[in-house]
Design a protein with these regions (language model features):
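Conserved PLP-enzyme active-site core in the AAT-like
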Residues: 1-85
């Protein structure tokens, strides 16, 4: 959003949920006007998350910081290893 996007889409399934037990995504809007224009369609077409799936995603979000920290740490270790590899 800070780079000028009107809408940002996030995969709740992969990152926020984190346990492969929910299929969801979310849209973040940079203005309430754009949100209001699309809300009716989102609501009436049934493209909103169910209460149970929202709870599952919320449960997974509680470990997001820990999982992201571990993923970053692992990526750094892999990068260090690859940096020293003679064929790379």
């Amino acid at each position: 959003m800070t780079l000028g996007a009107d809408v940002v889409m996030h995969s709740i399934t992969k990152y926020i949920g984190g346990h492969s037990d929910v299929v969801a995504g979310c849209l973040c809007f940079n203005s309430s006007e754009l949100y209001d224009r699309l809300f009716f369609n989102i609501k009436t077409m049934g493209t909103c998350i169910s209460p149970f799936d929202a709870w599952i995603a919320l449960r997974g979000s509680k470990t997001l910081a820990l999982r992201a920290e571990k993923a970053a740490s692992n990526a750094l270790e892999i990068g260090k290893m690859l940096e020293k590899h003679p064929k790379i």
